[in-house]
Amino acid sequence: MTSYSFTEKKRIRKDFGKHRSILKVPFLLAIQVDSYRAFLQGDVESSQRKDIGLHGALKSVFPIVSYSGNAALEYVGYKLGEPMFDERECRQRGMSYGAPLRVTVRLVIYDRESSTKAVKYIKEQEVYLGEIPLMTENGTFIVNGTERVIVSQLHRSPGVFFDHDRGKTHSSGKLLYSARIIPCRGSWLDFEFDPKDALFTRIDRRRKLPVSILLRALGYSNEEILGEFFEINTFHINPDKGVQLELVPERLRGEILSFNLTDGGGVIVEAGKRITARHVKQLEASGISALAVPDDYLIGRILSHDVIDATTGELLASANSEVNEDRIVAFRKAGIESVGTLWVNDLDRGAYLSNTLRIDPTRTQLEAQVEIYRMMRPGEPPTKEAAQNLFHNLFFTFDRYDLSMVGRMKFNRRVGRKEVAGEPVLYDKKYFSDRNDEESRRLVSKLGETSDILDVIKGLCEIRNGRGVVDDIDHLGNRRVRSVGEMAENVFRVGLVRVERAVKERLSMAESEGLTPQELINAKPVAAAIKEFFGSSQLSQFMDQNNPLSEVTHKRRLSALGPGGLTRERAGFEVRDVHLSHYGCLCTIETPEGPNIGLINSLAVFARTNQYGFLETPYRKVVEGRVTDEVEYLSAIEENQYVIAQANTLTDDNGQLTESFVPCRFQGESLLKPPSYVHYMDVSPMQTVSVAAALVPFLEHDDANRALMGANMQRQAVPTLRAQKPLVGTGIERTVALDSGVTVNARRGGVIDQVDAGRIVVKVNESEIIGATDAGVDIYGLIKYTRSNQNTCINQRPLVNVGDIIASGDVLADGPSTDIGELALGQNMLIAFMPWNGYNFEDSILLSERVVEEDRYTTIHIEELTCIARDTKLGSEEISADIPNVSEQALNRLDESGVVYIGAEVRAGDILVGKVTPKGESQLTPEEKLLRAIFGEKASDVKDSSLRVPPGMDGTVIDVQVFTRDGIEKDKRAHQIEEYEIKRVKKDFDDQFRILEGAIYARLRSQIVGKVVNSGVDIKKGEVITGPYLDGLKKSDWFALRMKDEVAVEAIDRAQKQIQAYQKEFDQRFSDKRSKITQGDDLAPGVLKMVKVFLAVKRCIQCGDKMAGRHGNKGVISNIVPVEDMPFMEDGTPVDIVLNPLGVPSRMNIGQILEVHLGWAAKGLGHRIQRMLEANAAIADLRKFLNEIYNHDKSLVGERVDLSQFSDDELLNMAKNLTDGVPMASPVFDGASEQEIKRMLDLAELPTGGQTQLYDGHTGEPFDRKTTVGYMHYLKLNHLVDDKMHARSTGPYSLVTQQPLGGKAQFGGQRFGEMEVWALEAYGAAYTLQEMLTVKSDDVQGRNQMYKNIVDGDHQMVAGMPESFNVLVKEIRSLAINIELEDN
């Protein structure tokens, strides 16, 4: 039985899951948080840090040695400082949340004169290397005041890959095989066959070279190359006639001989017959070691070695040349006894490298290296040294090439080596054994006879020969996840490499000029690289903050796009498709619709990344047909070799698999196997889906396309004014709400001491207090009415009361879209599926007025409007209430500084911040001169540029922030805000101090009451301390008390020290805060003052808003109908929403119907509980009824609810929370069956068919037949008609075409397009058409004249020449065709 926490006891979900959960859902943000923690290693001692992240990057670049080698800069360690501003201040001020990185480096200068490297002097110093962004505890970064998320990237793993072109390159359709070595950084190396079966190589996708050039550059001769890649047949040449072949019978298979093959006695194979496997066996059995063959058997074979006349030293035939009659004669003449030839055939022993050597123009190692140099650096004259250096730097030095740990592991596995660790560079035995430097000797002694490049070429030839398979690049074994930490590390290293170049230049001067490390290192390149990555990288995204689910999903997203990844245009179907290896790692449902489909995925619920960055998913181990509780994580590569059963496989009480054949997955196939064959079993039925898809109840009854829409639309739900838990959920709602970080969770257990709307104070349990300085009080500040990235409102509400006993992890306060710690994205609405006067045609939604009245879907949006006063050429702009030509009425909401009051209700066009801008002198008319002479000079030289409320917006001002540049005097409003802030902070600190002080005194009191006094204020020696005595004593006099009991005296001293320490700490913190508030702000160049005004906008639901269920059933509200007109039930209850029943069958999302039935049952059970409470039923009866609801079905696993844990008060409290409906959980792929839903309906005393008789609201008549009615969780999406509705009066025009701009943001017009023109033509409305194409569009003179005419009351128009005609003329002239208009 599970024990219930304080929060869970308030309301328990009835779970229909039949499978016991073995593994709790892991922390959902772990992929972000763990990755960045490993990158920073901030809490690890400097000496204990691993070579990853910041530490790894610094170690890989340092030491930096000068060109002369006389000076070096070594890395010692690093530490992260304290952030200057906390998260809240960074959001408010538009700053980035980060900590300064200080690296300790050591400058070592060596003595030039001494023969050994003697150290002349050492200087160690701390160097500032810029700000490193810090991650908030919810996995986000604050960059320039906005929350951003770094999305993890799914990219191709480094290593070696074999592939073919699918027959697309050559017209014959022949498969051309290729191999590619991809490093983590460095040059790519490709090998590929051409249609003539020669093998070529490319470096960095440049022009191809024969592969033998690369091998020759490594130091291999022709003979060595042939010896590596071919087996040799040896022929002994008889002096007079005939040849003896050293027989390996297997090598004759498939050949047709021109002579009989005998074994001394009988003929084994007749001439002209093909040798088969049977013949080969006979030959092996006969034991013949040599075979006499005629001379012509040798003709046409390829020599494996040079043949040299021993007496004269003459080269008779070179390796890789063919044997002909003349050469056989020459061999006999020179007395050559034996020659070796290559064993090749057309079937499975291709002569690929032999063909390649024939087209290779080079002969020596240097020639080959020069050829590679010419290909890499065309046009540069090659020198011996340059060619050698370039070749060495390509693949063999760690500075320029890094295969990485992952790449080496993948490489070694693919070429069939046992060990997975190794060197990050490509190794070749021949190349490194020929070199004589220390690093090469180390590599040769460690790695010996292996060769990476040769192994890859051999593997490619094997595949071409028909042995071996190509790789599937879409398999998750070949794609890995690059998370925040790794990307930040790569960016940091790039910055450091830029620093290294500059430092190397300066190091030579360091000795002569006595430079220090601080003078050597310029931190700008590092800081710039990091800032660029976090600020503007494709993977650094503005966080989707619509609701808690959208935050969690955004942080768990995996993108195949981004630097080093794919592009939308190039990605084909295969990459986007669902792959067999996605099972349990990537969600098979959730992905965006549109151009990114399949390129952006979501992590499955239980998936995680392993040390190499590959995705892995957990499985339960199955031993001899019995399922154990042991859980193992397997990656896509490992999973391939096991038989894995599904989570819903039937087992008995001991975990023994009961079916004779179990449905399983093995090597990507689905099949049935006996239980004894099964190795593993899924952990949970929802293992294959992501968090968003796992929130859709009855997902198993929905079509996948609609499930995809449902999962995606939940992310767009706007948090409503009062969140309401879904009546039908899946049981994962609580996990999502807790892990998203929008709720406030208790850090430690204890008792609630104080609660108000903005703060919760917890007195911590004695057992959880750590150390002597810990006062045992936790203070939680709540977020109040803050703007999210999507302009929705973030607000936290306390759930606890004073005196409540809580445990660690309990939910203390709800955030947006959470209800008692559960995710609550929408509202439970009473829904009827029926047509209603055509108002639900094409997915439209009919809504009851009652929904609007009860504010069920009212949402609060917070808009931030900014006014900036800049320094201009003509003088500085000024924020003031003194604005020319504006009525008093327009200014009545501004204070004397020209800024709107908090609490003012404003509408479109109202002034929020008054601002005047100086304008240039213009030529004045005589009338204006007269006016100026009369009324003075002032009003003319400034123009009004105030911040006004944008069109279509109205709301209440809830906050104003004024930022003033350093060195500029603050206005009155800024001082008021400053004073208010200081007062607020002071009160906050005073309250905190008072709470802590109170807790210390309370604890001290319990320790000294009843003790005997030695001395003290107003008390005699030997008296006993009592409570009333302490109450009458000043608090400071408590510390004068001295007792006989040493422990009590210690307690008094400890309390005094604690209070003094806290006092000092709070004073320090207050002075820090105060200086931050009073200091000037760091504004952009040229900005003198900035005012931010926050408006709270209340949006009621209205026609045109988009709504959706969780099953992809979306629609737009077509009409809001009075309650009395809505269809109603027998008892008079009107329905809330009417949906079209035709929206269900074609879309195949039947889950919504099941949800409606179960939701109705849940609501009915709530009504029954309410009736029992109203009738003051006995607690025992209530207990019995709840037991019937929760524990009716013995087949439901150990999740049964133990009501004996609940006291009567707790049970009553829970029952009150259930009156609105008993929440149900129908887990994905393990949900409620039809019988269970019927049983619930029965228990709720509702018709088990799920349909009821409805009556017409207009007439009161019953409808013809019964209707499906019930409760569905319905969401309001962030596609509100208020944001889309737009009308243009007079607005801006495009510069070139002079046509009105388009779009709401540009205050544009509606496009009158081609089809609209056809419509007017069809109606013959010639004048309207002329007006549309001229004065209402781009006839500049015409529209100006029209304006004047309307002002004069003359309603006529004269159409002129449209500007677009002039544009056309200019376009034609740009083609050098003159076109002129003639007056006719």
Swiss-Prot record:
Signal peptide: none annotated. Keywords: DNA-directed RNA polymerase, Nucleotidyltransferase, Transcription, Transferase. GO terms for biological process: DNA-templated transcription. GO terms for cellular component: DNA-directed RNA polymerase complex. SUPFAM superfamilies: beta and beta-prime subunits of DNA dependent RNA-polymerase (SSF64484). Its EC number is 2.7.7.6. The keyword Transcription applies. One of its GO terms (molecular function) is DNA-directed RNA polymerase activity. The RNAP catalytic core consists of 2 alpha, 1 beta, 1 beta' and 1 omega subunit. When a sigma factor is associated with the core the holoenzyme is formed, which can initiate transcription. NCBIfam families: PRK00405.1, rpoB. DNA-dependent RNA polymerase catalyzes the transcription of DNA into RNA using the four ribonucleoside triphosphates as substrates. Belongs to the RNA polymerase beta chain family. This is DNA-directed RNA polymerase subunit beta. The gene is rpoB.
